[in-house]
Amino acid sequence: MELRRPRLADKETVLEMMAEFEKSQSAHDGGFWDTENFVYEEWLETNMQKEMGINLPENRVPSIQFVSFDDVGRALGFLNLRLRLNEGLLNYAGHIGYSIRPSERGKGYAKETLCQGLQVTKEKNIKRTLVTCSVNNPASRAVILATGGILEDVRNGVERYWIEVANE
């Protein structure tokens, strides 16, 4: 599995994955799009701007949009890495949001996606990474715990875990 920034060449597989999320009415944490007016090429441009901190909406921070892909290039899920925390992110969303397309859940992709995302936090010198999940999401909780998450507290139904990213 590979976690990387989406490219123009990934359009078909990413759109297919987005359609699967929409059809199943499944949450797509770590992947953000306007279902009414979505244009893939504009989404790629917006992702680049968000990473550089350009044209950020109020209360947003610079972030990197990733997509995970299997060995044949099929899109598996999203991961969004926020490069710093504001109050809302500190209380609810954390540094990383991620999700795996419904048909590929339960196969270890969420753990691998989060592990690769944590390697990026290390490269970005984020030593303690906040990852959150709903109290009603035992699968995400298990992934976070398996990657070293330590529960700090629960706020309004959101479990907040810190993961220490060691320098090697």
Regions found by a protein language model. Give the residues of each.
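Conserved beta-strand-loop-alpha-helix junction that forms the acyl-donor binding cleft
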Residues: 131-141
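Short aromatic/hydrophobic contact patches that present stacked aromatics
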Residues: 2, 97, 130-132
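Conserved catalytic-core motifs of GNAT/GCN5-like acyltransferases
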Residues: 132, 145, 150-163
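Glycine-/small-residue-rich active-site loops that bind phosphorylated ligands and cofactors
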Residues: 73, 88, 105-106, 136
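Conserved acetyl-CoA-binding loop-helix of GNAT-fold acetyltransferases
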Residues: 97-100, 106-123, 141-146
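Conserved GNAT acetyl-CoA-binding A-motif
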Residues: 121-132
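GNAT-family acyltransferases
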Residues: 1-95, 156-168
